[in-house]
Amino acid sequence: TLWQGSLFFLPQHQNKRRQKNNMNFWNTFAALFSNFGALTWQMVVMWGIGALLIYLAIVKKMEPSLLLPMGFGAILVNLPASGAITQGDTVGPISALFEAGMSNELFPLLLFIGIGAMIDFGPLLEKPWLMLFGAAAQFGIFFTLFLAGFFFDMKDAASIAVIGAADGPTAIFVANTLKSQYLGAIMVAAYSYMALVPIVQPPVIRLLTTQKERRIRMPYEKGNVTQLTKILFPVVVTVVAGLVAPASVALVGFLMFGNLLRECGVLNSLSETAQNVLANLITLLLGLTVAGQMTADKFVRPDTLLIMALGLVAFIFDTAGGVLFAKLLNLFLPEGKKLNPMIGAAGISAFPMSGRVVNKMGLAEDNQNFLLMYSISVNVSGQIASVLAGGLILSLMA
């Protein structure tokens, strides 16, 4: 009968449904853990690097506003099939940030506005001859450009060489403009060496100077710089830089615009916003964005170690260039006018760390040897010189 037939088929139908449900469950369960099969040892290495950056940011307080997002981002983008970066036709948010703020160099330039608003060029304008040390301390960039040319193509070599400026935004801008495939490694190297200034610079300085030279006192006589001079300075520097190295106009212009906000006297609230809110926000976005380029396939390779080594060479030779230039000048100066060669080491762009390191070393040799005003002035000149050097590199590579 019809009723008996339905009884016969009902258990079989339920059994098939149960089998189908079981199959769906196991398929779903397998899908949840399928990414484990896609995990590689290189990704695990990147997790370790990300964890190290987070540790340095939190425990050692080394550039926390940058290294913390960079470290977390490095973990984020090295998860199998990570949704944070573009996968196939699906655009990831970090990839979108890169396109919006890095592919057009917008983030580094906005950061330069904040940096410019932080810098007081007054001490440098009191003694403009100190700008020579900023120029001399860029020697390592061009030495490393020559050296890196043996291992990389010239555009990558130029991007790596700019690490020596100890200026993260300039390094990012140059590497991104030249479309270097090593952007992530270059940024990690640049900011790592900036943070390691108190460790890297003192041994180089001691190696190149005698105790007598390190004890040379340089009494500071405060000059008079008018407000008009401070306002005209960023405008004049931008025009001169544009005429000498047109490729540097964006870098120099945004840096000097930030300084003009500081000095004009009518935009104090905007100046404070640029120094605090803008600079911190852009630094945060930079860290996350560049982390998107720190995928295992791009980062875990022998080239990365070579880039770190070349960056260290550039940094050391920049420091040496400034010190040796001061020693050269001393050959032509009378006994009472000798310069303390250590101030030349502050000509790199790591502001204000390098200036403080030099002052601390001076006080360690002689507790009455105050070099801070000179070293900070040279450090400020290094900010301008590193940006000009980056622009010159871009002009040479054009």
Predicted features along the sequence, with ranges:
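Alpha-helical membrane segments and immediately flanking helix-loop junctions
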Residues: E99, S103-N104, I113-M118, L132-F139, ...
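Intrinsically disordered, low-complexity non-transmembrane regions of multi-pass membrane transporters
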Residues: N22-A38, V44, P203-L232, V266-E272, ...
